[in-house]
Amino acid sequence: MCIGGILMKIAVMAGTPIDSKLGAELLNSYGYNDVVLVPISNNPVEQTTFQALEDEERENIIVKIIDELKEKGCEVIFVYCNSLSSVVDFDRLAEKMNISIITPMQMYRNLGLEYKYLAVMAANSHGLTGVENNLYVSNPRLRVLGLSMLELVKAIEEGNKPEQIVDDFNF
């Protein structure tokens, strides 16, 4: 897509291939069609294992991927994964590596200002903690009910319809 006459290639980085695809679909719906899918893991369990790595090891993997994306001409990275953006300091990496990186955590810092109470459902405790922390940055008085459930993410990844998920999990 052109922004101000400039064509941009955007990398969609996410925890799994399904998440990457969902992120690309979101961008496509806004006219951003030159996207590169960057799943970090093959499935939610692998992604949770990746997130449990030592900080330095995890960051080294992400830095290598960012270097490869820059070589491919990607100018922006859109991180479409709460838990991944919770365990990697993408704000710092964006500055350090001179690339624009957009994450859900940036949005949560704004969202916290709009509400008094929020319920947060996340794949795992990494994502839940990151979302809560970023909500509280903007609104320390916010009341958050948090739930982490990897099985819910697996159901989404399997392509289950929302109605089926509601029934299966007794929501």
Put a short name on every predicted segment:
Residues 2-171:
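Non-catalytic structural scaffold of enzyme domains
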